[in-house]
UniProtKB/Swiss-Prot annotation:
It is found in: Preautophagosomal structure membrane. This is Autophagy-related protein 9. Expressed in roots, leaves, stems and flowers. It is a multi-pass membrane protein. Belongs to the ATG9 family. Residues 744-781 are annotated as: Disordered. Its main location: membrane. It comes from Arabidopsis thaliana (Mouse-ear cress). The gene is ATG9. Disruption phenotype: Mutant plants are hypersensitive to nitrogen or carbon starvation and show early bolting senescence. The chain crosses the membrane at residues 95-115, 154-174, 405-425, 434-454. GO terms for cellular component: phagophore assembly site membrane. Homotrimer; forms a homotrimer with a central pore that forms a path between the two membrane leaflets. Residues 1-94, 175-319, 341-404, 455-507, 529-866 are cytoplasmic. Residues 320-340, 508-528 dip into the membrane without crossing it.
């Protein structure tokens, strides 16, 4: 067995790994064609079939090290075995998928070829047969084609082609089942004998623990001869291709100049000079094709980006056109399969529970938009699924009274007819066989029942308290997505409409996926090729060579020196704005990764990043503790900061989502919130040359000059800008139990202080009662409660209400000075009196991994691309 001591200079010179930290490796000799073999140990013997105890090395058995050429494939299968929860779960899953696919083929073939639908419609059975004097019908004779292929029409040819195509696909999956079974058994051996983890333990063991065991195994069995393995290296290998797709979306490269009404079109992220809006698009079908054309084709067998791929955009454009043309030819067969699949999966559910069609789920675009760098699949699903309830609650903040009124009337009328039919059924069941207008009463009962269920689902709940800001903050706790254009406008229809493009009705999303089968070929042939140059330039600019890993997206490598943003706590600031990630996604991804893998030790810049956040957190905690220690100041600020009452504990374990433990900075403080957006909004107050200081000086002078000026306006402006963004960017449900709930500065909109999940609705915690408006008195909710003299939504008027569409980079990198100068200018441009208002669900084909082909082996020269 090769020990770790064998890793010497000769080995390093043989592999010639290069680390491109300061610049893209694609511009510094990226494509070296040396063979990069990774050494991996053999597996020990499998334990006895009935035993769950992992076996060790018996009878002097030794584990020899043998090199493997594809460490990416090893990490991928290691994770797949963990995600699918062991050997028997994998076997059962594959068997069920094969049976399901076979059933779809047989089911659709029988009903599309053998069933005579015209004969079935004209067949007379039951009372109809008796009344017509015919013999009782025989469905086999009446509705079954004895010769299904006669006559052989164009429709029949399409159906036969569909059956033949998917039959071949089923046979391919069947053979692949046995081919993968051997690899699955090998990885079971590896888990049992090398990691000492059984299938039962996998069910409850965190993924980070599995990686820790692999890292520990490296020291004794030399899994990688180039360098010591780390959790970061293995996850970068696992998500090598996915990180590029996440980066492309983050930089807006998958936005196309299409109309908003095209199925699958997401939010607009930028506008052209001529007014054309670019909408993000990533349907499931488009994702598959981009995966085939770009992600699976860009790497060679050494996990390096192929030089000819990035230097020849014409080849990629041709490939996109050919794939689009092939999809256009296959689209009739794909549509048939999708229709049959969706019918079998959802028809019974929609029939018995029609309201299911009006439920919502995140679109495929939103999932990739929310996903972070190096975030593995099961952790992301847990996070995104936790946001569904809160996203639904947010959309309920925008009631539709007219629709509810009409739906109540329709439900009342249809429910009345359904009730009459129920009474008839109780009196005499045979009466239901009677006919009215050619239909029996059973048919009417089904129709009225369905109409009643759908209309009742359209009736919106009557919310006693509308709090779009607070509800949006709960959404962002899990999605970590809060565009700057949303802040301060949570109660606007524009934000609601944009969220609805990401959080769609289930029925509408299924229809869009079917329509995307025809739209994707058009995009591939005529739209996507126009962005090929930008996509390849992104790959050039954001690819680095990591020793022992290969080429990866530089965002996933957490290079603060090249891509850092000091507004999000980075110790370095990228010289060019284009090098930074949008909305601080790299910084958020780093914090998430550090919390998910606590045993991983980052570099010095990463530690400095965490230190910056700790310092910021401690300073804010000290400020709030000082504020609360003064009774007079606490009382004065409580009138201006209703959100401070949110620090009351509210059953922190009730939600059942404990993912916030992943967002720890200090392991001893398990109630730590997510600080990055709070840090971002607070940087405006910490700059010595920031215009807000000039505004504060003016405010102070005016405060001393007049008694009518609100004495806490300066404090209100600073704290109000912090609250909403800190609250809306916390990483998860534990924000409700966080110790930093005491440190909630007033948000951009200080309204919405009542917690959405708080059953208590005390009047003293509802709004800001510091200023009394005699010009706009509010209605009193109850005679025992003080009147609300302030419009809680007037806060939004202090912001720019124009809905501007900008590019992602421009939106997130806009300087905070503009906001503060504008606020100060507006406050100083008017005479302020005491009576003035002064506030502010996826469709996956079976064996979807069949598209994950191994990197293409190419022989490229060691030359630079530029």
């Amino acid at each position: 067995m090769m020990s770790s001591g064998h890793k010497g200079p000769n080995v390093r010179n043989f592999f010639k790994w290069q680390r491109g930290e300061s610049s893209s490796s694609l511009t510094t000799g990226l494509l070296h064609n040396e063979s990069h073999e990774i050494e991996l140990s053999n597996y020990g013997g499998i334990p006895s079939p009935g035993s769950e105890s992992p076996s060790g090395l018996l009878n002097g058995e030794s584990l020899n090290v043998q090199p493997i050429a594809d460490l990416d494939l090893f990490v991928e299968r290691l994770y797949s075995y963990y995600r699918d929860k062991g050997l028997w779960c994998i076997i059962v899953k594959w068997a069920v998928e094969l049976l399901s696919l076979g059933f779809i083929i047989c089911f659709s073939g029988f009903f599309l070829l053998y069933v005579d639908w015209n004969g079935l419609q004209n067949a007379k059975c039951g009372m109809d047969a008796v009344e017509s004097g015919t013999k009782p019908c025989d469905l086999v004779k009446e509705a079954i084609h004895p010769h299904p292929l006669s006559p052989f029409t164009l429709t029949t040819a399409i159906i036969v082609g569909y059956l033949a195509l998917f039959s071949v696909y089923w046979l391919f999956c069947f053979l692949r089942f046995f081919a993968q079974l051997k690899d699955t058994l090998d990885f079971r051996h590896f888990y049992y004998n090398n990691l000492h983890v059984t299938d039962n333990e996998i069910l409850t063991m965190p993924w980070a623990t599995v990686l820790e065991k692999v890292v520990q195994l490296q020291s004794s069995q030399c899994l990688c001869v180039v360098k010591d393995l780390s959790a970061h290296d293995m996850v970068m290998r696992l998500m090598r291709k996915e990180n590029y797709l996440i980066g492309m979306l983050n930089k807006g490269l998958l936005s196309f100049p299409i109309s908003h009404w095209i199925p699958g079109a997401g939010p607009a992220v930028k506008s052209a000079p001529d007014g054309t809006q670019y909408h993000l698009v990533l349907t499931k079908t488009l994702e598959w094709t981009l995966n085939w054309c770009i992600l699976q084709s860009m790497f060679d067998c050494n996990f390096r980006v192929r030089r000819d791929f990035v230097s020849n955009p014409t080849t990629l454009k041709k490939r996109l056109f050919v794939v689009g043309l092939a999809m256009l030819l296959l689209s009739p067969f794909l549509v048939i399969f999708m229709l049959v699949y969706l019918f079998l999966r959802h028809a019974e559910q929609f029939y018995n529970h029609p309201s299911t069609a009006s439920s919502r789920r995140w679109s495929n675009l939103s999932k990739w938009l929310f996903r972070e760098f190096n975030e593995v699949d099961h952790l992301f699903k847990h996070r995104i699924n936790s946001s569904v309830v809160h996203a639904s609650e947010y959309l309920k903040q925008f009631p539709s009274p007219i629709i509810s009124i009409i739906a109540k009337f329709v439900s009342f009328v249809s429910g009345g007819f359904a009730a009459v039919l129920i009474i008839i059924a109780f009196l005499e069941e045979s009466l239901l066989e009677g006919h009215i207008f050619g239909r029996n009463l059973f048919w009417y009962a089904a129709v009225f029942g369905t109409i009643t269920a759908i209309s009742r689902a359209a009736i919106s709940d009557e919310l006693l308290v509308l709090d779009p800001v607070g509800t949006m903050s709960l959404v962002v706790q899990n999605t970590h997505y809060m565009p700057k254009r949303w802040r301060g406008k949570e109660n606007k229809d524009d934000v609601r409409l944009e969220l609805e493009t990401l959080f769609q009705y289930t029925g509408m999303m299924l229809l869009e996926e079917i329509a995307s089968i025809f739209i994707t070929p058009f995009l591939l042939m005529f739209v996507v090729p126009k962005r090929v140059d930008d996509i390849l330039q992104f790959i050039k600019d954001f690819t680095v060579d990591i020793e022992g890993v290969g080429h990866v997206c530089s965002f996933s490598a957490f290079y603060f020196e090249n891509h850092g943003n000091i507004k999000y706590g980075s110790p370095h600031n990228a010289t060019r704005r284009e090098q930074r990630s949008s909305q601080g996604k790299m910084e958020k991804s780093f914090l998430s990764f550090q919390s998910s893998y606590p045993s991983w030790e980052s570099d010095s810049l990463g530690k400095q990043f965490l230190s910056n956040l700790r310092t910021f957190r401690d300073r804010k905690l000290h400020e709030i503790n000082t504020r609360h220690s003064s009774p007079s100041r606490a009382w004065r600020e409580s009138t201006n900061t209703p959100a401070l009452y949110r620090d009351i504990p509210r059953n922190p374990l009730a939600s059942g989502n404990h993912t916030d433990s992943m967002w720890l900075i200090d392991p001893d403080q398990r109630n730590h919130p997510y600080l990055l957006d709070w840090y971002y909004t607070s940087q405006a107050h910490n700059r010595t040359d920031h215009p807000i200081e000039r505004a504060n000086e003016i405010l102070t002078a005016n405060q001393n000059a007049t008694d009518c000026w609100p004495p806490d306006l300066g404090i209100r402006g600073e704290d109000s800008r912090d609250l909403l963004n800190m609250e809306a960017s916390t990483s998860g449900q534990f924000f409700r139990e966080s110790i930093l709930r005491h440190d909630q500065p007033e948000g951009e909109d200080s309204y919405g202080s009542q917690h959405p999940l708080d059953g208590r609705n005390q009047w003293w915690g509802r709004g800001n009662h510091s200023q009394i408006s005699t010009a706009h008195p509010a209605t009193t909710n109850s005679f025992i409660e003080p009147p609300d003299f302030i419009n809680r939504y007037t806060a939004g008027n202090l912001l720019d209400n124009s809905w501007s569409r900008r590019s992602i980079e421009e939106e997130d990198e806009e300087e905070e000075e503009l906001d503060w100068e504008e606020n100060a200018r507006r406050n100083l441009s008017r005479t302020t009196f005491m009576d003035d208002n002064d506030i502010e669900a996826g469709i996956d084909l079976h064996f979807d991994d069949v598209y994950s082909s191994r990197p293409q082996e190419t022989s490229t020269s060691s030359t630079t691309l530029r």
